[in-house]
């Protein structure tokens, strides 16, 4: 839960890598209380944000990136294409 600013993502990704986890899941499908704060499914409804954040995760980490999309959208193909364009592994 960080702002959509590259430097913030770069910092948090370093912390995530330090945990030695196996990958990153971008939960852009979370509808519960996050969309009101500009996170979760709010980001997942804007393909440009999906592509941008996914790209940052790929650029600033060595881990695979999984993008969890929101079903609360008219056409899931747009966010799916954005995730792919950003370099998502799944």
Predicted feature residues:
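Glycine-rich, N-terminal phosphate-binding loop and its surrounding beta-alpha-beta segment
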Residues: 1
């Amino acid at each position: 839960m960080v702002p959509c600013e590259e430097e913030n993502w770069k910092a948090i990704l370093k912390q995530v890598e330090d945990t030695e986890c196996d990958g990153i899941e971008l939960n852009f499908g979370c509808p519960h209380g996050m969309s009101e704060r500009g996170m979760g499914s709010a980001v997942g409804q804007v393909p440009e944000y999906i592509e941008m954040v996914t790209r940052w995760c790929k650029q600033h980490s060595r881990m695979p990136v999984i993008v969890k999309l929101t079903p609360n959208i008219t056409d899931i193909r747009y966010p799916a294409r954005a995730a792919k364009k950003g370099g998502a592994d799944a």
